[in-house]
Structure formats: structure tokens, C-alpha cells
Amino acid sequence: MVNEEYRGLVYPWGRQSPIANGEPLEVAPGVWWVRFGMPGGLDHINIWLLEDSDGWTVVDTCLKLDSAKAQWEQLFTGFMANKPIARVICTHLHPDHIGLAGWLCERFDCELWMTRSEYLNGSLLLSYTSDVVPSTALQFYKRAGFTDELMTTYQQRFGTFGKMSEPLPHSYRRIVDLETRPCNM
């Protein structure tokens, strides 16, 4: 495997990556990289599986898609069949990262781990299910300099966040600044 550099970043795996919707690739002992395919310009998400003594730690989850749930089902009955999911960590609130967190936590009766701001903001955005944009939001973006074209796009997309994610669990385990968590324990 050859290290590759791009704009000062070093990619130790070079151009190697897991196949979309394929088998996990081990990048360190007990650390597995899985790629889930998604529709759109960003056509995939990288998901990490950390093998711990009490089960799997899942880092990020994919959008709420039937194809993603099917890929998870394949992992549950194949690669991950020896241990349950013990915890789900979401790195941030984007739907491709939190989309199936609630589904996984409910299925495996495990905790969601997130920072407070990401959990609370994600929960707030998931609550916007109406197609009607609040006037305060329109005023905010207009004052922020949105053009008429951007305002139209914002109005058309408003409320779609919740369609891309399952509801988050009602409780979570807060990740705090500088916290570390050893894996493979």
C-alpha cells in the first residue's frame, strides 16, 4: 500500500477503499471501514466499526434508506453476527451520519453517543417536518445576504431533514471535549 499526499494531507491507504455496499476493510486491529452508497453528488458515506469486548461500536450510520437498512442487515447476519452493537457514535448532525442512529439504537437497545450541541441541533432539525418555513427563518437568511435564488432553494428544501433520518433516541450519552475512549477493550 502506498501513501499518497494531496494538499498536505497524507492518505495512508492511498487510493484503496472498501467497495460501496461491500465488505468491511480492516484498517487497524479491530477497526473496520465500511462504505455505504447513497444517492446524490456525495455518493457514499464512510462508516466505522470498532470491535470491542462487549460488542460493536458503530461510528456514523447513513441516511434513512431501504438500501442502507438492507446493507446493515447483511452485516448483522454476516460480518457482525458474533457480537451485538453496544453503542452508536455520531460524529455530527448531518443526516448521512445520524440517519439510522435511532433505528440501530432501538434495535440493539444501545446508547447513542454524541456531543450535546450536535444532538440538540439534530433533534431540533428533525422536528421541522412542515413545508411552511417560519417567517423568522426567512428574515434571518434574507438579512444574512441570501439571494432570491438561494431563498427559493431554502424554501423548497425546508422540512426535508426529517425525511432523511429516523427519529433520534430521547436520551443520549454526551461526548465531551477531549474525551477519549479506548477501543478493543
Question: Language-model features: where?
Answer:
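A generic structural signal for short
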Residues: Y11, R35, I89-C90
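Active-site HxH/HxHxD metal-binding segment of metal-dependent hydrolases
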Residues: S67, E73-R181
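Short acidic loop-to-beta-strand element that houses the catalytic metal-binding Asp/Glu
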Residues: N46-L50, E179-M185
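Conserved beta-strand hairpin/beta-sheet module of binuclear metal-dependent hydrolase folds
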Residues: P24-K83
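Conserved beta-strand residues within beta-sheet cores
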Residues: N21, A28, Y172, P182-N184
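A short, structure-level motif marking secondary-structure boundaries and short turns
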Residues: R7-G8, V58, I85-R87
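Short acidic, Pro/Gly- and aromatic-enriched capping/linker segments at domain boundaries
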Residues: W13, S17-P24
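N-terminal presequences and immediately downstream first alpha-helices
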Residues: M1-R15
